[in-house]
Structures are given as structure tokens and as C-alpha cells.
Amino acid sequence: MNKQKGMTLLEVLVALAIFSLAGLTLLQTTAQQARNAGMMKEKMLASWLADNQQVRLHLNKLWPEKSATGALVTYAGEEWYLSWQGVDTEFSQLRALDIEVRRHKQDTAAIFSLRSYVVHE
């Protein structure tokens, strides 16, 4: 009797199915990581913008107005919308400063929010 050498068609198809599933899983994972990297970059840039605005307002020694103020800025080659507003605290000499960063003025959710406090001199 001759002994067969090699693999049967069924064995080849099973191996092919296993490798294709592994490839699809790897592709999905890579796509998810690419999406997350983009979101992380956007959040990082937004946090830098909020920090810069906070420092700018503190250096100018401005008492934050209670009305919302906003500005369209270009940063890292992209346009962003910054808004900031003073919020009263229980102490009259202390006011909270809320800064929010959005991609567009009409966006409902901020990409990044920052709260700091300003003492009235």
C-alpha cells in the first residue's frame, strides 16, 4: 500500500480558514488603534489650547466675565473654537474659569474642558 504524503483538501481549507480569521482580527485591531491614535492627538492638542488660553488670561490678570466668550483659533494647522466663562464661587474674591475646546462653534460636546480659579486682586 502506498502511504499518502501531503495534506488533504479538507486540511488545507481548515488551515486557510484559521489564517483568514487571524488576519481579519489583526486588521480590525490595527484599524481600531489608528482611530484611537487620531482621537488621542485631537485631545492632546485641545488640552494644550486650553492650557495656553488659561495662562494667557492669568498673565493678563483678567477677572473672568460671567458671560461666555469665544474665539476661533488656528493651531497645528487646524481650526479650533475656544470658549471661556467665569463662574461665581461661594467666595466673592474667587471666581472659577471654565475653558472648553471644540472643533466647531456649533458642536455640543467639548473635546476638552479645563477649570481653574482666579483670585481677584
Curated annotation (Swiss-Prot):
The chain crosses the membrane at residues 7-27. The keyword Cell inner membrane applies. The keyword Cell inner membrane applies. GO terms for cellular component: plasma membrane; type II protein secretion system complex. Cleaved by prepilin peptidase. Residues 1-6 form a propeptide. Disruption phenotype: Deletion mutant shows longer pili but their number is reduced. It is found in: Cell inner membrane. The modification N-methylmethionine is found at M7. Its main location: membrane. Keywords: Cell inner membrane, Cell membrane, Membrane, Methylation, Transmembrane, Transmembrane helix. NCBIfam families: gspI, IV_pilin_GFxxxE. This is Type II secretion system protein I. It comes from Klebsiella michiganensis (strain ATCC 8724 / DSM 4798 / JCM 20051 / NBRC 3318 / NRRL B-199 / KCTC 1686 / BUCSAV 143 / CCM 1901).
